[in-house]
Amino acid sequence: MKPSEIREMSIEEIDKKIRELRLELAKERGVLTMGASMENPMVIRNLRRDIARLLTIKREKLREKR
């Protein structure tokens, strides 16, 4: 996700997206733990970065409200 796309979202939408991505990350880690080889090993890295990006922009939005 691009930061510009995230900034257009509301805080509730950001929270929902974070939950979705964390669930997907847990599934991907579960597959990896079971010993299966991943088609694209960058998936976990990209999910973690997207979650971090969402949390950062959420924090920015909350600080603006103060």
Curated annotation (Swiss-Prot):
Tagged with keyword Ribonucleoprotein: yes
SUPFAM superfamilies linked: Ribosomal protein L29 (L29p)
GO molecular function annotation: structural constituent of ribosome
Keyword Ribosomal protein annotated: yes
Keywords: Ribonucleoprotein, Ribosomal protein
Pfam families documented for this protein: Ribosomal_L29 (PF00831)
A GO-annotated cellular component: ribonucleoprotein complex
Example GO BP: translation
Subunit structure: Part of the 50S ribosomal subunit.
Assigned protein family: Belongs to the universal ribosomal protein uL29 family.
Protein name (database record): Large ribosomal subunit protein uL29
Taxonomic lineage: Archaea, Methanobacteriati, Methanobacteriota, Thermococci, Thermococcales
Primary gene name: rpl29
